[in-house]
């Protein structure tokens, strides 16, 4: 049996490493990466990322490599079982969300429908 806690959302090593680097560049160790869902995009909902130095009541935090990912409760319900990752490729570098709850996604991967 594993001692590792199963979290409703995964924060990959690659994403944590990039967040740590970006926070270092900003010279503000209180920053956290916030992922959120808003209405919009070509599929109905879209993912958003921002740096935030606040944790609000009800927010879930996931710590990895000394940095935190923050998700509000409304967004979390759409992200359960998913993962926040960071990728670099021919199309550029970006944070991405792998979301098993999405019935369809747009070509750019930043919007989805449930």
From Swiss-Prot:
Cofactor(s) listed in the protein's UniProt record: iron-sulfur cluster
PROSITE patterns: HESB
Free-text cofactor note: Binds 1 iron-sulfur cluster per subunit.
An example Gene Ontology molecular-function term: 4 iron, 4 sulfur cluster binding
Gene Ontology cellular-component annotations: cytosol
Matching InterPro entries: FeS_biogenesis, FeS_cluster_insertion, FeS_cluster_insertion_CS, FeS_cluster_insertion_RrpA, HesB-like_dom_sf
Keywords in alphabetical order: Iron, Iron-sulfur, Metal-binding
Positions in coiled-coil regions: none
NCBIfam families: iron-sulfur cluster assembly accessory protein (TIGR00049), PRK13623.1 (NF010147)
Function: Required for insertion of 4Fe-4S clusters for at least IspG.
Family: Belongs to the HesB/IscA family.
Name of the protein in question: Iron-sulfur cluster insertion protein ErpA
Originating organism: Yersinia enterocolitica serotype O:8 / biotype 1B (strain NCTC 13174 / 8081)
């Amino acid at each position: 049996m594993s001692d590792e806690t199963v979290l409703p959302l995964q924060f990959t090593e690659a994403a944590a490493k990039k967040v740590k680097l970006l926070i270092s560049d900003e010279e503000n160790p209180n920053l956290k990466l916030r992922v959120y869902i808003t209405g919009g995009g070509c599929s109905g909902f879209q993912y958003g990322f921002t740096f935030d130095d606040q944790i609000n009541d009800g927010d879930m935090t996931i710590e990895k490599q000394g940095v935190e990912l923050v998700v509000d409760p409304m967004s979390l319900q759409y992200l359960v079982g998913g993962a926040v990752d960071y990728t670099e490729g021919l199309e550029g570098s970006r944070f991405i969300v792998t979301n098993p709850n999405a019935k369809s996604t747009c070509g750019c991967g930043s919007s989805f429908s449930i």
